[in-house]
Amino acid sequence: MHASLDGFVGGPKGEMNWIKIDDELFDFVGKIVDQADVGLYGRVTYQMMESYWPTAGDKPNASKHDIEHSQWYKRVDKVVISNSMKGGKIPKVQIISGDINEGIGQLKQKEGKDILMLGSPSASHALMHHNLIDEYWIFVNPILLGVGIPLFKNIEAKVNLKFIASKVFASGVVGLHYEKS
């Protein structure tokens, strides 16, 4: 999850044009993404991803990152947290609605690699509320937004975290890795 130094993950209207992305960060995040075989999204982020990533790697001007992430996106199962998303069976997509504890609990019991949530602030807030996030990678960008969508919301009890690693990027972004202790 990208965040501003003052703790916002999006501007007041969800804007993300302030996020510093470059090849160094793409390569680093690509290694994290490769450790996952499930992409976890909120409905809005899933729809945004679905409109771009399935064909992003096929475009003539596709970057190395576009090709790699497009291949990953098409390969992995997607899980969408949504009470409003309806529709027929979508290949490689599972929708969790209603009891988020039960849905995520069942997902965590499955064999496989990591479950990775990219973005999805509303879904992240719901998972935080139920203390369902095991690890955090937060990429702090060198900007103060002042207002916007907060990184942390709906946390009702203290959650102890253990520092795992940090990474400073040439762009000024600092990656922070924590896990629940």
Give the positions of each predicted feature:
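Portal/gating segments that form or line small-molecule/metal binding sites
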Residues: 1-132, 142-181
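Non-cysteine beta-strand/loop elements that form the S-adenosyl-L-methionine
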Residues: 139
